[in-house]
Amino acid sequence: MSSLPHNHHYETHHRGTAEVPFDELIGVTPDGVPVISNGNEAHFSNLESITAACLPLSSFERKAPCKQPYRKMGVKWQCVEFVRRYLASRKAVWMTSLCTAEEVWREENLFVDVRDGRPVEVVRTPNKSTGPAPAVADIVVWGEGPETPFGHVAIVTEVCASCVRVAEQNQGFEKWPEDVPFSREIAMRTTESGEVELLDEDPLLGWVTVQAPFYNFDDGDLADSFRLVVGQGQILRQPFPKHVDVPWLNTGEECDTILKHSLVVDGNMGEGAHAEEGDVPGAFYFLDYDMFCRLGRAASSLHRIAMAATAKVLEDPESTHLLEHYFGVPPEIQPLLRRSWEMTPPMGGRFDFGYDGKNVVMLEYNCDSSGALLECCNTQEKMARFYGVSQGTSTGSFLGAKCVTYFQRLLTNEKVCPQHRLIHFMIDEDDEERYTARCMMGFAEQAGFRTKLCVKLVNFRYRDGPPSNAAPLATPCDHPTIVDGEDEEVLMVWKTWSWDTVLHQYHSQRSSSDAVNTPTLSDILLNNNIRVLEPLWKAVTGSKAILPFMHALAPDHEHMLAASFLPTREIISRHYISKPVNGRAGQNIMMYDPVTSPTELEGAPQQDICEALSQNASARSLLNGSPLPLSQSVDQTNECSPGKFFDSVLVYQQRLFLKKFDGKYFPIFCGWMVGDEFGGVVVREDTSKITKLSSMVVPARVVRDNVPLGVSYSDEGET
């Protein structure tokens, strides 16, 4: 660090005597926007500040840079860059390019709404005028002067009785103290005639009010895209008293009624209904802004890689072999899978992220599942209201809005959307499937679809002739038309059955000699007239067999563990696990100690699928290799899980040691994807190191403000 000169300008603008180096954090505003050091006022880096969500997380993404609009924030770390980033982060408003900071005062048509590009109006209040006083998020503008040769801009962060506090870049370079979340104070006075004046030795022109509300995170997360991640992030688990009568659930709502029925003892919904204590959450997780953004960007990035890996599998010269032997898709079904890849967009899924106290790492991608949807988008907010937890917002606040948007887009997709706009929601006889389906049906209906709930396979039958309500651009096929009990054509289905289950039933049906006159599960979901959500190609993307392909494309990704079909030297030289590619709910995961035998390490495969793919070679010969038998030592200090979903190939993966909270709990942070967009976070925790179907969903909050995590609470019932 170097000393600052002691002249009038520095003495009035700076608190300390030492500069924070260029590109390092000075402080964070009360509402969560970082201020970064430019080093000194004379420095012009000529380096571009890129919208945070566009920054690549691996070499794979650096090969195909983000091309979305509103990507360039300005020159690092000038005052204009900060104002542009602040407005984008807090209001989803974009400030167009400027030659100098002073132009903010005089140029017209400077601001647009990031969501739709519409102009945003402003009010300019000259200094020492009778206009409105400065308010939080206003832009203070200086003109050209000896110390501000290009003008200057800052953001009002707080208004006090006799001053305003502002945040700014390229004016003041000392680290902010913990209790001083602003750059400086500017004296303010009001004259007897009602004129408001900000007192500063530099030529202060006035303040600009951007007439747009703060961004509503119930509607989406667009504003999060612009937030810089400046630290590893923090997570707090705060215990709360358990209420076994689950009073936050509103039995006047169908979804809540079904959810309560699934929780209470013996399904008793009468007086005294209660759940077992072990079935009710007893805590909230609080995530700071850095952590939430890390999770969201990891999910978005890894989804792109998963899609690219799926394409890689389908394009491989030996794709027929790969699909059959590693993903369980028989050759006769593969044309239907490829058609679904071409026709039907992804709907949703969840990344399971592990956290070791520092790293956030993907464990797997459950993208053929909608479990914990209601709990994420609805229940955890109701719990927050019951407990009086107002800090932050639900980590699923915008999940419902994203689902509605997905269905709205689907409604305009002429390749997919049937003309009668009807979706059949097919589920098994299970409370969780029922309330999840009802929740999703509500989103589809908001978008304009009609819906029907179909429990098991009751009342489906075949009908002669082609469907009359097929999507306008659907390709005719020779598959039979299927109708429901009211003779309405089944042309779009949302399902809870996994594709593993569907394909298993398909194989069983083929090997059976029993005649079947009504449509079976596979007859419906493998019918080329019917578009399915999730589509059949999710049998690839949703399989754990995709993990080695993902790692092959982005081996340096900061949120991914090494994975392979072979016990490679890279994997077995550390703690590692094995798991079946189609295992679910944590079944048959085995944990192993590192292999220490020099002979075994020397004989372990060094090449894996990564090298084959990078050379555009067929992966078949590599995957068919027989690894040397290992003297695998099961990690006796940790847990393994018995059982299998179906017999399948194994994937080997490096192990992450999960952080234990409150000396007992191991959470998994599940990052939702809806379509191709991040949808929020839901947390599942267990006292076991392996998350299972029975693992508790625990409410979570994201705290975007710059405040300590957690709330004060006294157990006095609902507040």
Swiss-Prot record:
Pfam families: CHAP, GSP_synth. Keywords: ATP-binding, Ligase, Magnesium, Metal-binding, Nucleotide-binding. It is an enzyme of class 6 (ligase). Mg(2+) 1 binds at residues 352, 364. Residues 54-200 form the Peptidase C51 domain. The record marks 350 as: Transition state stabilizer. The N-terminus is blocked. Conjugates glutathione (gamma-Glu-Cys-Gly) and spermidine to form glutathionylspermidine in the biosynthesis trypanothione (N(1),N(8)-bis(glutathionyl)spermidine), which is involved in maintaining intracellular thiol redox and in defense against oxidants. Mg(2+) 2 binds at residues 364, 366. The keyword NAD does not apply. Transmembrane segments: none annotated. Its EC number is 6.3.1.8. It catalyses: spermidine + glutathione + ATP = glutathionylspermidine + ADP + phosphate + H(+). Its cofactor is Mg(2+). This is Glutathionylspermidine synthase. Coiled coil: none annotated. GO terms for molecular function: ATP binding; glutathionylspermidine synthase activity; metal ion binding. In the C-terminal section; belongs to the glutathionylspermidine synthase preATP-grasp family. ATP binds at residues 350-352, 544, 579, 586, 653, 689-691. The keyword Cell cycle does not apply. Glutathione binds at residues 350, 369, 433, 501. Spermidine binds at residue 432.
